[in-house]
Design a protein with these regions (language model features):
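An extended, acidic
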Residues: 154-274
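Generic detector of well-ordered alpha-helical packing
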Residues: 58, 62, 81, 98-101, ...
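N-terminal subdomain of lithium-sensitive/metallo-dependent phosphomonoesterases centered on the IMPase/IPPase/PAP
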Residues: 7-99, 261, 268-271
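Residue-level signal for inorganic ion chemistry
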Residues: 32, 57, 68, 102, ...
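Short secondary-structure boundary/capping segments
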Residues: 44-45, 69, 84-87, 129, ...
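Small-residue (primarily alanine) positions within well-ordered alpha-helices
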Residues: 21, 25-28, 127, 146, ...
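DPxDG-like acidic metal-binding loop motif
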Residues: 88-147
Length: 274
């Protein structure tokens, strides 16, 4: 795959807006990658890796806020760690997860990402998802397509559910929706070729956009889990909704996606269950 030039604007392919998002994601990504190396030492010594991860998360969010606010001073900012910060421009908001896949990061598993979405009047118009561990950079802008390191993305074309590999989320034991997730998996396990549970919603969505996964569903997510990923899937030719099939994941917190066929089949199966 091609490489997005580090921190340098790409005149041919990407807008000024995307370049702002990429530059911010890469800078925060370098910080997280350094912290990942430290985590591996802390795992051996058992000296409070969880506290360290919390600090790494907050540090990455502040870096993102600083860079994005400098480039677009009036925009609002909705972040997992710092909550909502109102901007003077009420029509635009960044929706940011500075470290999606915290548990993976805590255990030194290189499946985590920075997720940046930009909403205009409540509709996501651009997204960047960056995994600094493997330098995979996903970008999408409304009407302009989705890309992974400069390569155009398309969702997978399979039209038989029993040939599909799908991902799902599994809430922690004790959460009210844990039992429902297990029930959904039990119903679907005989209908698909396989399940994957990677532990980072933004990357699950990006993997659907890239055709690596045929579908993905999860309930009770937050806007920062979904914002960048949903435009990624749509710009790659996929369909995204809530469990009802025609609802907005940003409003409901539930997401189902895949190509048009897979999305429809998943909705048909999941909707009656919960």
């Amino acid at each position: 795959l091609g490489r997005f030039p580090t921190d340098k604007p790409s005149i041919m392919l990407y807008s000024a807006l995307i370049n702002v998002m990429v530059k911010a994601a890469r800078r925060a990504g370098r910080s997280l990658k350094r912290d990942l190396g430290e985590i591996e030492h802390l795992q051996v010594s058992l000296k409070g890796p969880a506290n360290f991860v919390s600090l790494a998360d907050k540090r990455a969010e502040e870096m993102l806020y600083t860079d994005l606010a400098k480039a677009r001073p009036g925009y609002g900012f909705i972040g997992e760690e710092g909550g909502t910060r109102e901007g003077t421009d009420k029509s635009h908001s960044w929706i940011v997860d500075p470290l999606d896949g915290t548990t993976n990061f805590l255990h030194g598993i290189p499946q985590f990402a920075i997720s940046i979405g930009l909403a205009r009047e409540g509709t996501v118009i651009a997204g960047v998802i960056y995994n600094p561990a493997n330098d995979e950079l996903y970008i999408a802008e409304r009407g302009k397509g989705a890309f992974l390191n400069d390569q155009r993305l398309r969702v997978a074309g399979r039209r038989r559910l029993d040939e599909c590999v799908v991902a799902c989320g599994l809430p922690h034991i004790g959460r009210g929706d844990h039992g429902l997730a297990l029930k959904e998996m039990a119903v679907l396990q005989n209908k698909v070729a396989g399940f994957r549970r990677f532990g980072a919603a933004s990357l699950d969505l990006a993997f659907v956009a890239a055709g690596r996964l045929d579908g993905y569903w999860e309930r009770n997510l937050s806007p920062w889990d979904i914002a960048a990923g949903q435009i990624m899937v749509r710009e790659a030719g996929g369909t995204v909704s809530g469990i009802e099939g025609n609802d907005d994941p940003l409003q409901t917190g539930h997401v189902v996606c895949g190509n048009e066929f897979v999305h429809g089949e998943l909705v048909k199966i999941l909707k009656p269950l919960g």
